[in-house]
Every structure is written in structure tokens, then in C-alpha cells.
Amino acid sequence: MNIRPLHDRVIIKREEVETRSAGGIVLTGSAATKSTRAKVLAVGKGRILENGTVQPLDVKVGDTVIFNDGYGVKNEKIDGEEVLIISENDILAIVE
């Protein structure tokens, strides 16, 4: 993938969701919701502050994150791969 997000943007790939419960029941409809966990594929250089300095992002390529899947999330297909472009503000946590 040859893409570089700008400023505080992050490109992520959503993790697959389990389609079976722990008991082996196949989940469908609202029970099989989209995952809000993703792998970070690329990050911008950072947020530009009012004084003109650049604040580096807290996330890095390879991190697994939990994100807010709402307004401001941009779905794209790059090199045949479904990815999301989000602001770092939409990342709620880094899974360690």
C-alpha cells in the first residue's frame, strides 16, 4: 500500500469479527456487529498546533487500536483492500 495520511490522520484496517459465539452459535444481523478494533497501517506526521509546531501522534504503525466508528470515519478501498481513514481523536485506546 502506497499512501501517506496527512497531519493527524491515521489509516487503519478493521479486524475480523467472530461470526460464532463461544458456544458455537452462528451470529447474524445485529449480533454480528462490525469490530471497532483495527490495525494501524499508516500515520500522518502529527497535529499542527496553534503556534505552528507539530505534535507527533501517540499511535504508530502496527498498533492495534479501539476506535469510535462514527461520524468522520472515511471508508476507502486502496489496492483492493478495505481501509478506514480517521483522525487520531477518534482512537479511544491502544491495545497492549
Curated annotation (Swiss-Prot):
The keyword Cytoplasm applies. Its main location: cytoplasm. Keywords: Chaperone, Cytoplasm. Gene3D superfamilies: GroES chaperonin. One of its GO terms (molecular function) is protein-folding chaperone binding. CDD domains: cpn10 (cd00320). GO terms for cellular component: cytoplasm. It is found in: Cytoplasm. GO terms for biological process: chaperone cofactor-dependent protein refolding. Signal peptide: none annotated. Heptamer of 7 subunits arranged in a ring. Interacts with the chaperonin GroEL. HAMAP family: CH10 (MF_00580). Belongs to the GroES chaperonin family. Together with the chaperonin GroEL, plays an essential role in assisting protein folding. The GroEL-GroES system forms a nano-cage that allows encapsulation of the non-native substrate proteins and provides a physical environment optimized to promote and accelerate protein folding. GroES binds to the apical surface of the GroEL ring, thereby capping the opening of the GroEL channel. This is Co-chaperonin GroES. It comes from Haemophilus influenzae (strain PittGG). The gene is groES.
